[in-house]
Amino acid sequence: MDGKEFLSKIETEMSKCVVGKEDIIKLLLISMLSKGHVLLEGIPGLAKTTIVKNFAKTFGLSFSRIQLTPDTMPSDIIGVYYYSEKTKDFAIKKGPIFTNILLADEINRTPPKTQSAMLEAMQECQATVEGTSIKLPEPFILLATMNPLESEGVYSLPEAQMDRFMFKITLEYPKKDEEIAMLKKKYEGSFETVNSVIPPEELKEAFEKVLEIKISDEILEYIYEIVKMTRTDDRLLYGVSPRTSEQILYASRALAFLNNRNYVIPDDVKEVSKYILVHKIKLKIDYEIEGISNKNIINEILDKAVVFKKTGDN
């Protein structure tokens, strides 16, 4: 199965439960193929949870969901040791993090200590329960939803955690035709149940094909040029880390696969960078007051960055 067919199967299945959102579904698929984590931000009611839950259903993988609240404890996510009366010994009760796809709903409703419980899993694909490190199933993908910081009762995510999210996707209000189509489907009762359409062997094959995507030295230079510009911009308190460069590399290869190419082009890099960079930079307060946003800075950088030599399929 080629990349476009792979994407089409997911989009067709997802159309049973959501109207529009093709760009978001594509980004979720890129993150899946890159084994990256995704943060979806938006006010309540924009179908964040619906999108993530049903996207997970399209794969033949294990899935767990945890609704995060101010009193959620790290052990509620990772698990605990307990004494078993049956075996007369201590055993581990694994938490919901031991799954292929974890939906962390309203991640910024819970305190930083609990949020940080997911850091090890996001980076090392393992979790430590009472000093014992246990590998998570592979792939492990965290899909988290969050409310805007202007909402009541929310916490900022730690910078270390934000850095581990490959994409941050902001959901906007639906367009007129999309909302009307959604209302019509609700009225007619025509939304359908989403099924698994990508079995594990097909997903494994897709992972392998992504790893075969070629990337030239010129494209690597282009990626470095982009991240360097975030580090030297006087309007920023700090730029992005080398982990971000890796995320751009992985996501660009996944996008090339979905476009049925066996090599990365600059447009692949530019397209994924918009969603990878935006949450990993910090504006100085003076520029925030002036109304400049992270998105403004990233768009400016991507417009200025150039590839010094034309790349090709070689």
Question: What positions do the PLM features span?
Answer:
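Walker B catalytic acidic pair
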Residues: 42, 105-106, 117
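Conserved alpha-helical scaffold flanking the Walker A/P-loop in AAA+ ATPase domains
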Residues: 27-30, 83-103
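P-loop (Walker A) phosphate-binding loop of NTP-binding proteins
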Residues: 43, 77, 145
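Conserved AAA+ ATPase small/helical "lid" subdomain
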Residues: 193-248
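Pre-Walker A (pre-P-loop) alpha-helix and adjacent loop at the N terminus of AAA/AAA+ ATPase modules
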Residues: 2-46
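Canonical AAA+ ATPase core
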Residues: 84-89, 110, 114, 122-198, ...
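Walker A/P-loop
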Residues: 32-69
